[in-house]
Amino acid sequence: MALRKRRSVPDASDNPKHVPARASLPAPRPSGSTKFMTRVVMSFAMIGGFVAILYGGHMYAWGLVVVLQTLLFRELVNVRYRAAAEKNIPWFRSVQWMWFVVALFYNYGDSFGAFIESSKIRFVPPAIVHYLRYHTWVSFTMYALLFVMSVLSLKKGYYKYQMGQYTWTIVTLGLIVFQMKYVLTNIFNGLFWFLFPVSVVICNDCFAFFCGKLFGRKFIKTPFLRLSPNKTWEGFIGALLCTIVYAFFFSAFISRFSWLTCPVESFEFKLIPDPLTCTPHDVFLPHSYDVPVFIARVINRSQIQLLPIQLHSFWFAIFASIISPFGGFYASAIKRTYHLKDFDSVIPGHGGVMDRMDCQLITNCFTTVYFNTFIRSRIPSVATILNLVVKLTLEEKQDVLQAIQEMLQS
C-alpha cells in the first residue's frame, strides 16, 4: 500500500529560526570612523529636515507622521515576512495593508473630532462636519468588510502561518497606530507639544551613548539589562541628569517662538502658511515662585521667575529617561528574536525608521495624557460652545439665547 503523500508546503512554524534570511552579496564592512561619520551626517540632515517641516506648519508635521507610520508598518510586517509562503496566498499582503489603512482612517478621524470639540476654532468647513458626522459608521463598515475578507483569505495548509501574521499585524497596529492615536491632537495643540517631547528623547539617547562611552562600568560593574548588554548604569544615570538640564533650558528657549506654541485656529491649507500669532498659553508666560529657605540663603533671593513649562519639563525628562528607553529595549527583543541587526537600511548609519522611533511612540502617548491632565483647561472655550450651538435647531438656539440673557440679568 502506497504511503500517503504529505502536502508539499507544510503548515508554517512560528520558530524564528525558520524565517529565511534575505540573500545578499557579501560587502566589505566600513570602518568604525566611517560608520560614525555617516551616522553624524545623517543625524544633522534629519534634524535639519525635521525643523524645515515644522516651520512649514501643522499640516506638514501631520504628513510627516503619516509617512513615518507607513514606513514603520512596512518594517514591522516585514519582520515576519516569508516570501515562500506568501507566494501561494494571493492578496494576503494586501489585506494586511488594508488593516493599516482602516486603522489610520478611524484613529485620525476620531482624534480630529476630539480636537475640534475642545479647540478655539470658530468655523469648521461643512465638508469636515459632514465627514465627522459619518466617520464612525464608515469606519465600522470598512472594518466589517475587511474582517470578512480576512477570514475568506485563510488557505488550507497555511492556517497557522496566516493566524500568526494576523496576530503580529494587530500587535503592530497597536504599537504604531493606536499608541499614537492623539499625535494629531498634540500637533494641532501647538507644535511645541510635538517638537519638545521628540527632542527630549533624542537628547536622552545621545547622552546615554556618550556617558556610557566615557564612564561605562567604571563605577557600577553590575550589568544594566541583559537584553541590551551594551547599556550601562553610568550611561542611564548620566543621561537622566543631562536630560533634566536640557529639558529645563530648551523648553524655555522654544517657548519664545509663537509658531511653535500657537494652536491651529483654522483649517485653511496653504503651501507656505502665514506665521501664527496668538495669546500665549499660561504655561508659556513667566511666573514668580518662592524659593526654599536653604536655597534663598545661597542665591540671596526669595523669589525667582520661571516659565511654568520649565517645571513641567522635569516630568518629560523623567519619563524620557526612565520609561521611554524600554521602547528601545522592546525593539531590541524583537530584533534578537528574529536575528536582525536593524529593522531596515533606509537611513544610512541608523538602520530603519523603527530603530530611530522605538522610544518615541510611548513618549507621544505620555504627552497626550500629560497635556490633557495638567495643561489643558477644563473650562470650555467660547469656540467650543459655539461649535455646539451651531448644531442646534433655530428654536433651541433661541432657548439658549434666552437662558444666557436671564443669566446676565440675574
Predicted regions: what is each one?
Residues 295-305, 342-353:
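Short, membrane-exposed interhelical loops at transmembrane-helix boundaries
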Residues 336-344, 353-410:
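C-terminal membrane module of polytopic membrane proteins
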Residues 239, 312, 316, 324, ...:
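Feature representing long, continuous alpha-helical segments
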Residues 217-238, 340-351, 369-370, 377-378:
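Functional transmembrane or membrane-interface alpha-helices that line membrane-embedded catalytic
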Residues 319-323, 344-348, 359:
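Transmembrane alpha-helix interface/packing and boundary motifs in multi-pass membrane proteins
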Residues 60-62, 77, 333, 374-380:
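Transmembrane-helix exit/juxtamembrane "anchor" motif
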Residues 2-323, 404-410:
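Membrane-embedded alpha-helical bundles of polytopic integral membrane proteins
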